[in-house]
Amino acid sequence: MAKKNKKVVTQGIAHIHSTYQNTIVSFSDLKGNVFAWSSSGAIGYKGTKKKTPYAAGLAAAAAVEKAKEFGLKEVSILVKGVGPGKSTARKQIETSGFTIKDVKDVTPTPHNGTRPPKKILKREK
């Protein structure tokens, strides 16, 4: 069987989706086709450790290593969500050696749409 050649992507988009429970970092080409991704859960964290900023930084570092195998040089960063790991993941991508074109926050905000889910209750011990 012939060895499949990896496609070379020099410009791309880094998508950071940060929720209260997990952080997902994915790299796509300019058309939106994802070629590298990682998340806090995918690198081995479970439960409440997935939502930590440290786990988000490790997930971003793992995604960056996968993206560098495709020859990525220039990145636009899109940040979505309100989770605790979004700034750590963004900083990890910025310090990884890519040329950063721009950083955008694309968190969807409702204009009084549907009713939001009820708040998470924290139990006192």
From Swiss-Prot:
Disulfide bonds: none annotated. Residues 101-125 are annotated as: Disordered. One of its GO terms (cellular component) is ribosome. It holds the Pfam family Ribosomal_S11. One of its GO terms (molecular function) is structural constituent of ribosome. The keyword Ribosomal protein applies. PROSITE patterns: RIBOSOMAL_S11. One of its GO terms (biological process) is translation. SUPFAM superfamilies: Translational machinery components (SSF53137). Keywords: Ribonucleoprotein, Ribosomal protein, RNA-binding, rRNA-binding. InterPro entries: Ribosomal_uS11, Ribosomal_uS11_bac-type, Ribosomal_uS11_CS, Ribosomal_uS11_sf. Residues 116-125 have a biased composition (Basic residues). Part of the 30S ribosomal subunit. Interacts with proteins S7 and S18. Binds to IF-3. Located on the platform of the 30S subunit, it bridges several disparate RNA helices of the 16S rRNA. Forms part of the Shine-Dalgarno cleft in the 70S ribosome. Belongs to the universal ribosomal protein uS11 family. This is Small ribosomal subunit protein uS11.
